[in-house]
């Protein structure tokens, strides 16, 4: 580890921290329906969209109607994207004459982008046409991110409203998320990326002659526009197979820093949105502090492990950090930081190959996802995820002091606790059940690219990434098979909607409750004691479940490596 490396980590943290308050202020005004700087331009468009949809910003929904609207919208998006890939060969904007995508891969990809996972069992530049990339994947990048933001806002309203029956309007929340937050920021980011050298063209791939006289095809396309929402919406699916390790998708250190900040910007700002909407910004800062503790710990372990390198290589006189699978233009520090960021959020974009990390270096991204990606997390998804852990933490605190648990004046009772536990338990169910099944099926084991404990880690990482709606992978696993396309697809659906529905049920229950005034016995939720309780709850409830599986994978791999054994 070097001072320069830690300076880059601190620079990233400083930029994100500086954006939390202004972006949170703007987003709070957007979701409260207040006037913003963009209102003169966007308000007429917003009203026009409501008129076309047959709804109104004054029309609010019960949580069940909110959930039904969300499910219906996502089902339509899945069907449209699936059809687009299946009929890709006869559609326009296909200069490379890409054939139709197979049914299993189309199912997996459609589920992947609808759930904001962006798991990719294909190479974008060798499989998909420009139309599919733009009208299919990029559109879903916007609306899947907006869906997560809408769910988070609905849950926040349940805490902020004194009493009522409705949690908002899904269509209004989604339109505002897209129109006022995602779209303006992405327009700016797209222009910046083009300025930095990222391609943005509808022209065909370029054929170039190499120095040896051979012909080389250079893939280009509408990359910058997809890249902007890919990072800002914590989607992660790359235009190119190499994702953000590709020089056309991440040219230099400046673009790399912008991409890392984009991943965390909205998720971190949601803590400030929460504080503003509940009338106490200290509540939001406390949640951000808990996220920060877990994030810095993860960065420290990953950076240390990668900087220390592989002791087996040191025996050959090759000192230095682990540079396998990393880009020289980023080095160990920025590669380690990017890996922790992309798995702390539900992004999944990579600027280095996680499968080439050391055992402990790869352990941290795995744990980040298994915790439910609540360390900032995906746009919206990370925040409603950590609110589920807050419900459990407050319930435990109430039991310890013998009082009815309360959070922000709302009583946390049996129904809220059951729904929170249900949402949290669906993740290990999807991650571990599919992993266990895959390890005993010869056809699934045949896809493993590495022997020993790392081979098990490849399977565990795949299903963890799918259920956590992350999308990154240990690259040694061949995922484009019928088994993995179907089971990973179901894992993504479970990890997305079996968390969202209980979260909305909690919102529907809490919004009907009257706010109880704070008293001398009320547990303070804006100080260091609450931060410690929340961190402990996340680690114990969210992480302890996976300890046996981790012991068989990365922990065993580290011990084998330390013993000097190869596999």
Swiss-Prot record:
Subcellular localization(s) per the UniProt record: Cell inner membrane
TM regions (residue ranges): 5-25, 65-85, 136-156, 179-199, 254-274, 285-305, 330-350, 352-372, 375-395, 421-441, 486-506, 529-549
The organism's place on the tree of life at top rank: Bacteria
The keyword GTP-binding belongs to this UniProt entry's keyword annotation: no
Gene Ontology, cellular component aspect: plasma membrane
Pfam families tied to this protein: KdpA (PF03814)
Membrane topology term: Multi-pass membrane protein
Keyword entries, A-Z: Cell inner membrane, Cell membrane, Ion transport, Membrane, Potassium, Potassium transport, Transmembrane, Transmembrane helix, Transport
Major subcellular site: membrane
Gene Ontology terms for molecular function: P-type potassium transmembrane transporter activity; potassium ion binding
Function statement: Part of the high-affinity ATP-driven potassium transport (or Kdp) system, which catalyzes the hydrolysis of ATP coupled with the electrogenic transport of potassium into the cytoplasm. This subunit binds the periplasmic potassium ions and delivers the ions to the membrane domain of KdpB through an intramembrane tunnel.
Protein family according to the UniProt entry: Belongs to the KdpA family.
Binding partners and assembly: The system is composed of three essential subunits: KdpA, KdpB and KdpC.
Listed name of the protein: Potassium-transporting ATPase potassium-binding subunit
Phylogenetic lineage: Bacteria, Pseudomonadati, Pseudomonadota, Alphaproteobacteria, Hyphomicrobiales
Gene name tied to this protein: kdpA
């Amino acid at each position: 580890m070097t001072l320069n490396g830690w300076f880059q980590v601190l620079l990233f943290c400083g930029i994100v921290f500086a954006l939390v308050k202004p972006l949170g202020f703007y987003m709070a005004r957007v979701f409260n329906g207040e006037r913003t700087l963009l209102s003169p331009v966007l308000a007429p468009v917003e009203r026009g969209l409501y008129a076309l949809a047959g709804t109104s910003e004054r029309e609010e929904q019960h949580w069940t109607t909110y959930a039904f609207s969300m499910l219906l919208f996502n089902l339509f998006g899945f069907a449209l994207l699936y059809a687009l890939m299946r009929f890709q060969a006869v559609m326009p904007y296909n200069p490379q004459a890409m054939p139709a995508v197979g049914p299993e891969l189309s199912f997996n990809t459609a589920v992947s982008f609808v759930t904001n996972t962006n798991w990719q069992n294909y190479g974008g530049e060798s499989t998909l046409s420009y139309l599919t990339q733009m009208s299919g994947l990029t559109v879903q990048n916007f609306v899947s991110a907006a869906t997560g933001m809408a769910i988070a806002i609905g849950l926040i309203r349940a805490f902020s409203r004194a009493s009522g029956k409705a949690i908002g309007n899904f269509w209004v929340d989604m339109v505002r998320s897209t129109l006022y937050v995602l779209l303006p920021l992405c327009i700016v980011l797209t222009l910046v990326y083009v300025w930095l050298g990222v391609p943005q063209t509808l022209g065909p791939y370029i054929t170039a002659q190499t120095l040896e006289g051979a012909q080389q095809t250079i893939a280009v396309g509408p990359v910058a526009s997809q890249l902007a929402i890919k990072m800002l919406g914590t989607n992660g699916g790359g235009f190119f197979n190499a994702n953000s390790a590709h020089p056309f998708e991440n040219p230099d250190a400046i673009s790399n820093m912008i991409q890392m900040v984009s991943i965390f910007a909205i998720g971190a700002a949601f803590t400030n949105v929460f504080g503003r909407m509940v009338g106490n910004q200290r509540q939001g800062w406390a949640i951000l502090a808990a996220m920060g503790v877990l994030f810095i710990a993860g960065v420290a372990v990953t950076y240390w492990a990668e900087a220390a390198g592989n002791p087996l290589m040191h025996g050959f006189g090759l000192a230095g950090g682990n540079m396998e699978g990393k880009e020289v233009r980023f080095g160990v520090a920025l590669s380690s930081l990017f890996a922790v960021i992309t798995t702390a959020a539900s992004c999944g974009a990579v600027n280095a190959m996680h499968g080439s990390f050391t055992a402990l270096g790869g352990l941290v991204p795995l744990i980040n996802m298994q915790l439910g990606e609540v360390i900032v997390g995906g746009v919206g998804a990370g925040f409603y995820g950590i609110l589920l852990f807050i419900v459990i933490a407050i319930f435990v605190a109430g039991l310890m002091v013998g009082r009815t648990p309360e959070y922000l004046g709302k009583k946390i009772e049996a129904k809220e606790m059951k729904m929170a536990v249900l949402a949290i338990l669906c993740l290990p169910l999807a991650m571990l059940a599919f992993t266990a099944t895959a390890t005993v099926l010869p056809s699934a084991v045949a896809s493993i690219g590495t022997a020993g404990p790392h081979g098990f880690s490849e399977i565990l990482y795949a299903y963890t990434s799918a259920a956590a709606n992350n999308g990154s992978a240990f690259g040694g696993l061949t995922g484009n098979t019928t088994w993995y396309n179907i089971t990973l697809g179901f894992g993504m659906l479970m990890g997305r909607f079996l968390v969202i529905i209980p979260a909305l049920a909690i919102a529907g229950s809490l919004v009907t409750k009257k706010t109880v005034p704070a008293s001398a016995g009320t547990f303070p939720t804006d100080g260091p004691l609450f931060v410690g309780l929340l961190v402990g709850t996340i680690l114990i409830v969210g992480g302890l479940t996976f300890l046996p599986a981790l012991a068989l994978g990365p922990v065993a791999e580290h011990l084998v490596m330390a013993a000097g054994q190869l596999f």
